């Protein structure tokens, strides 16, 4: 009589066994974590017709951006929660060291009043812009089809919160030296009404309602964030250096270091998606829709930057070259 076979237990992390090597810390804590993808017909393994399930089925599962195995994506930097905190603790110490050193030197008191007026208009309202980018990254984290993508969105969200808090901190400092320029009081009005910001406001507000996960990724990481980085960080930082604001230049350089990491995982995800036939057209169609909004936002903002001839074209060229480097 044949004896029933004894089932052997699966090895720990059996989903990574195909690689035939001990999985890395990154792979162990980052891969295949989305339980909401186990049953595509019923995300979260609850009523398939409840609003949240319908939302994920429409905006994630039915996205025209397809791949047979999104869980195969890997962050090229292999960032995990532990290493992210180690990395950014050092970066925050650097930034707040800048704040302390320049404050001790009386940096703000030495700024030209005319330049401070530009900061009140073109820098301080940026916290509204950064908050919109933060919300967009948080949505991408929630809606992405793989945990390795969601993790990248999570760290990007946290980085953008850093930018926002840096801006808020500097706004408060500048209000101490220039109490007649409305620092800390007039930013919302400028964000909602100043011509310099209306292109970016249109871009990010529309991006926040691009609910398909793939289109959200394109609008945010391929258009909005590069436009902000090239104009509101790089070009403004260069204008600051031209006007004796060394602190602003160093601060934007530190923020652009975060942006470089975002760009690496963005490029890796684009190249991963392009492995699937048809995704090139999907991405191209979305870029045709969103890239003009990004260029218009750059033009509107850079038109008001002082001492910055050619800033708008340089920023647009930077965005276009970035997308070309991804194969788009």
Name the predicted role of every residue range.
Residues 155-173, 227, 254-269, 293-296:
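Alpha-helical scaffold segments in carbohydrate-active enzymes
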Residues 113-191:
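Long, hydrophobic, well-ordered secondary-structure blocks that form the structural core
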Residues 126-129, 156, 221-225, 251, ...:
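Amphipathic alpha-helix face/heptad-repeat signature
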């Amino acid at each position: 009589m044949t004896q029933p076979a004894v089932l052997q237990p699966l090895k720990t992390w059996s989903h990574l066994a195909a690689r035939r090597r001990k999985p890395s810390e990154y792979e162990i804590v980052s891969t295949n974590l989305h339980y909401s993808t186990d049953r595509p017909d019923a995300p979260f393994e609850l009523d398939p017709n409840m609003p949240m399930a319908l939302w994920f089925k429409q905006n994630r599962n039915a996205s025209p951006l397809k791949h047979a195995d999104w869980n195969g994506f890997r962050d090229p930097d292999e960032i995990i929660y532990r290493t992210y905190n180690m990395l950014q603790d050092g970066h925050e110490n650097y930034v707040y060291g800048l704040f302390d050193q320049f404050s001790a030197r009386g940096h703000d008191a030495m700024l030209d009043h005319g330049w401070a007026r530009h900061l009140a208009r073109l820098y301080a309202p940026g916290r509204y812009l950064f908050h919109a980018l933060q919300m967009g990254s948080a949505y991408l984290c929630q809606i992405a089809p793989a945990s390795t993508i969601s993790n990248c969105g999570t760290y990007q969200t946290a980085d953008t919160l850093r930018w926002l808090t840096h801006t808020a901190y500097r706004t408060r400092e500048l209000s101490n030296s220039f109490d007649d320029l409305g620092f800390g009081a007039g930013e919302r009005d400028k964000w909602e009404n100043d011509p310099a910001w209306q292109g970016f406001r249109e871009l990010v507000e529309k991006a926040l309602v691009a609910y398909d996960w793939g289109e959200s990724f394109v609008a945010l990481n391929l258009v909005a964030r590069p436009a902000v980085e090239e104009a509101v960080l790089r070009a403004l930082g260069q204008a600051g250096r031209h006007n004796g604001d060394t602190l602003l230049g160093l601060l934007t350089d530190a923020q652009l270091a975060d942006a470089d990491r975002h760009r690496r995982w963005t490029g890796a995800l684009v190249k991963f998606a392009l492995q699937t036939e048809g995704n090139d057209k999907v991405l191209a169609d979305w870029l045709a829709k969103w890239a003009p909004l990004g260029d218009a936002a750059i033009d509107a903002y850079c038109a008001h930057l002082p001492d910055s001839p050619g800033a708008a074209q340089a920023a647009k060229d930077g965005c276009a070259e970035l997308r070309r480097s991804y194969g788009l």
